[in-house]
Every structure is written in structure tokens, then in C-alpha cells.
Regions:
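Loop-to-transmembrane helix boundary motifs in multi-pass membrane proteins
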Residues: 5, 11-13, 19, 134-139, ...
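A generic transmembrane alpha-helix motif of multi-pass inner-membrane proteins
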Residues: 361, 366-391, 411-444
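Inter-helical loop and helix-membrane interface segments of multi-pass membrane transporters/permeases
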Residues: 3-4, 31-36, 66-91, 104-159, ...
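Membrane-interface "cap" regions at the ends of multi-pass membrane proteins
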Residues: 1-28, 56-61, 65-78, 82-87, ...
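Hydrophobic alpha-helical segments of multi-pass membrane transport proteins
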Residues: 309-314, 335-353, 369-403
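Transmembrane helix-boundary motif of multi-pass solute transporters/channels
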Residues: 10-48, 227-230, 240-244, 248-251, ...
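Membrane-embedded translocation segments of transport machinery
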Residues: 2-6, 10, 161, 165-309, ...
């Protein structure tokens, strides 16, 4: 099966950034920044991106471009004779499927809110009522899956790349318009002070760990989510520069989300919390109290649809690519089968708040928490640790092969003095994040 290629460098950057940008950029990063020292937290976060995010992203792009296969076979393609790294390709497939088992439902929620604002039904919105409605959850899950796999059923350049370019461009325009509007609200000064004023007294060990976690998880490295796009590009540009472009775009979206949210929340004296309640309850209340709220609310949730759908498209492309390489199916056939499988598995989450109740951990947890635990607490950190060990050591692909691949082409290069960062610092920090996450997890 001939390997498809992206048509442009812009398409590659937009696709990679789109996969990284998601709901977490909106409901987690701004809240963490505001609660944990504002500008001082942002400085620590940016430092963590340099130490963690850029190296992890370069590793994923490199292994994908070198292997020219999906993540299912990339370890097998690059391992030395007699090695058994290939088994970790299945780890990548499991991670992507588990992510779509709940993220497609979240995307459906965003589409539902957008539709309700567009119809002028925003006054009756309620997050608890929505998630406890089996019909709403299942219908908008179906809408999400059908849209995603319909787009993916076309060829790479004519389907995914073209749609993502338009969608990401529209997302950035919408965010800029919403940010400018928020800065003219009467509570903008107070909101921006809460968001960005440096307060180093709030910086402690837990805040630094939080910054490391956010810098690491925002890029979703570790299960081939970025490697697949590396496999679709040529060798005209080195990969350090490409990683910086993607991270810059991802960080810009996260920053602008805070500019949109905090002035609005402080204008209408609404509590700022992390999690879905910030997005669905708080922001819906903001727009319901705002002049022209139906229009601004529709634009906000349209931007959120683009953010969520870009992640769904990126991850589903990864699943589709892996299954197609395993079976030899065409894009249309693979899209139908994979779409059906994702929909059926995601029903656990869609119905988990009502008829299909399951409490995996502490009281109040559901299927969504179970799938999130599989992905965020296990596959992402462990997958990234495996990737770092494989790429930078002789018992894997090896540092020389990695640096040769990452530095091929024009642009910024990985320098030889960075070897200890990639080979020792990165794996140690990832292992720490994993152990810390498991030790502080609320099991019961």
C-alpha cells in the first residue's frame, strides 16, 4: 500500500497542532495558571515545555518519519534484529482507541451546546441534565463519529488535511475575535490580573509538578498521536523547528482561552473552576448574562467544536492508519469499520452517566474516568518513557539514528550537547510524573 503524503508543510503543522489542541487547553491550562501564580506559573510552564514538550515531540516526529508506517509497526520497522520493541505498537493502538472511547462523547457535548446556542435554546442548558440524557449523549456521539470518519474516508490531502487547514484557521480567527471582545468587558482588568499577575509565593513543589504534567500531557505524546503525522511528511525540514512551531500554536490557543474566559467570569462574578464545569456551566452562564450572548456563545462553542473535532480527527486518523496497515483495507471500508467500533466502545461513556453506570474508582467516578485513567495516567507517560528509551539508547533504535533523522532538512537541529537531556533527564522526569500521578490518584 503506497504511503500517502501531506501536501504542504502548513498542513503538517496544522494537523499536529490540531491534534494537540483540545478541550483541556480551554478548561485546564487557564485555571491552573490563574490559581497557581499567574505569570510566574506561565514562566515555569514554558520552561517545562522546553525541557519536556519539545524533546518528546521531536522524538515522536522522528520515529514516525523514519519508519514511514503507522505507530502499530514503527517500533518493529526500526528495531534491531532480535529485539522485541514491536510489541509496543499495540500499546499505541490501545491508547488511541481508549482516548476515543470518551473524547468523542466530550466532543458531542460541545456540538450539543453549539447547536443549542445557535437555536436560541441556551437559557435552558444544564450540564447535569445533558450528561444524564441517554438520547442526547448517544445522538451527538453518533454525529461526532459520522462527521470524523466521513472526512477520513477521503484521501489524506483532500479529506483530513484540507478540512483541518480550514478548521484551524477558523479556530484562530474565532479565538482572536472572542479575546478582543473579552478585553472590552468591564471585568477584564480584574480577570487579566487574576490570570497573569506573577505571584511567586504560590509556587511550590505541587505547582511545579502541575506545570510539568500540563506541559507533558497537552501534546499527547506517547501513543503515536504525533508520529503518524511525521510519517506523512518528507525530509525537507528538520524536526526541532517543526516541533517548536506546533508547540507555539498549542500554547497560543491555551493562552487565548484564558484571555477569553477570565474577563468574562469576573465581569459576571462567576466562580472559576477547573474541568468541564468551567466550559459548560460557567461559560454558558456568562453568555446567558451577556448582551448579544446568543451570538457570542454560538461563536465560543463553534471554536470549541473546532478544537475538540481537530483532536478527534487526528486520533481517529491514527486508528484508521493502524487498522488499514494491519488489514490492507481501503480508506472507505476502514472508516466504516473503525467508526462503528469507536461508536460502540464510546457507548460505555455516553451511557455511563445513566443506564450503564459503573464506578471504577472513588465515589462519583464513571466510565469516562476509567478511560481517562487508562490514557492519561498510564499509556501517555509509559508510552513516552518507552519512546525515549527506544530512540536514545543502543538497546533500541539508538541516539545516532535518532539525531540523523531529526536533523535531516533545513531548520533548527538537535545539538550533541542535548544528548543528556533526551537520554537521562527526559526519561527520569517522565518516570517521576507517572509515579507521582499513581501515588496521588484518588483510588477510593
Amino acid at each position: 500500500m503506497k504511503r500517502e503524503q501531506l501536501g504542504s508543510r502548513l498542513g503538517f503543522i496544522m494537523l499536529s497542532a490540531g491534534c494537540a489542541i483540545g478541550c483541556g487547553n480551554v478548561w485546564k491550562f487557564p485555571w491552573m495558571c490563574g490559581q497557581n501564580g499567574g505569570g510566574s506559573f506561565m514562566l515555569i510552564y514554558l520552561l517545562c515545555l522546553v525541557i519536556l514538550g519539545i524533546p518528546a515531540l521531536v522524538l515522536e516526529f522522528s520515529i514516525g518519519r523514519a519508519a514511514q508506517t503507522s505507530p502499530l509497526f514503527m517500533y518493529r520497522k526500526l528495531e534491531k534484529p532480535g529485539q522485541k520493541w514491536g510489541i509496543f505498537g499495540w500499546f499505541c493502538l490501545l491508547g488511541n482507541i481508549a482516548l476515543m472511547a470518551f473524547y468523542t462523547v466530550v466532543c458531542g457535548w460541545v456540538i450539543y451546546y453549539f447547536v443549542q446556542f445557535l437555536r436560541g435554546k441556551n437559557g435552558s442548558l444544564g450540564f447535569s441534565a445533558m450528561i444524564s440524557s441517554p438520547s442526547v449523549n448517544v445522538f451527538f456521539l453518533l454525529v461526532t463519529v459520522v462527521i470524523a470518519f466521513f472526512i477520513l474516508s477521503f484521501n489524506l490531502q483532500g479529506g483530513l488535511e484540507r478540512v483541518t487547514k480550514y478548521m484551524m484557521s477558523a479556530l484562530l480567527v474565532l479565538m482572536l475575535a472572542l479575546a478582543v471582545h473579552s478585553l472590552f468587558l468591564k471585568g477584564s482588568g480584574e480577570g487579566m490580573t487574576f490570570y497573569l499577575k506573577p505571584d511567586f509565593s504560590k509556587i511550590d513543589g505541587s505547582v511545579i509538578v502541575g506545570a510539568m504534567n500540563q506541559a507533558f500531557f497537552t501534546l499527547s505524546t506517547g501513543m503515536g498521536g504525533m508520529a503518524i503525522f511525521g510519517s506523512y511528511i518528507g525530509k525537507e525540514h528538520s524536526l526541532m523547528g517543526e516541533a517548536i512551531h506546533v508547540i507555539t500554536l498549542d500554547t497560543l490557543v491555551a493562552f487565548l482561552a484564558g484571555v477569553i474566559i477570565f474577563p468574562a467570569c469576573f465581569t459576571f462574578n462567576l466562580e472559576v473552576n477547573a474541568g468541564p464545569s468551567l466550559l459548560f456551566d460557567t461559560m454558558a452562564a456568562v453568555f446567558n448574562n451577556m448582551s448579544g450572548g446568543r451570538i457570542w456563545g454560538s461563536l465560543f462553542f463553534l471554536f470549541m467544536v473546532f478544537a475538540a473535532m481537530s483532536t478527534v480527527l487526528g486520533v481517529c486518523e491514527n486508528i484508521l492508519a493502524m487498522i488499514r496497515e494491519l488489514t490492507g483495507w481501503s480508506r472507505p471500508k476502514g472508516s466504516v469499520v473503525c467508526g462503528t467500533g469507536v461508536f460502540l466502545l464510546a457507548l460505555t461513556t455516553a451511557l455511563g452517566f445513566s443506564v450503564f453506570h459503573f464506578q471504577p474508582f472513588a465515589e462519583g467516578t464513571t466510565w469516562l474516568d476509567f478511560w481517562d485513567f487508562i490514557v492519561s495516567n498510564n499509556i501517555l507517560p509509559l508510552g513516552s518513557l518507552i519512546l525515549a528509551l527506544f530512540c536514545c539508547n543502543k538497546f533500541g533504535w539508538g541516539w545516532d539514528n535518532f539525531i540523523k533523522e531529526s536533523n535531516t532538512g533545513k531548520g533548527l537541529k538537535v545539538q550533541s550537547w542535548m544528548k543528556p537531556l533526551f537520554r537521562f533527564v527526559l526519561p527520569i522526569i517522565i518516570a517521576f510524573i507517572y509515579i507521582y500521578g499513581m501515588s496521588t490518584f484518588n483510588w477510593r
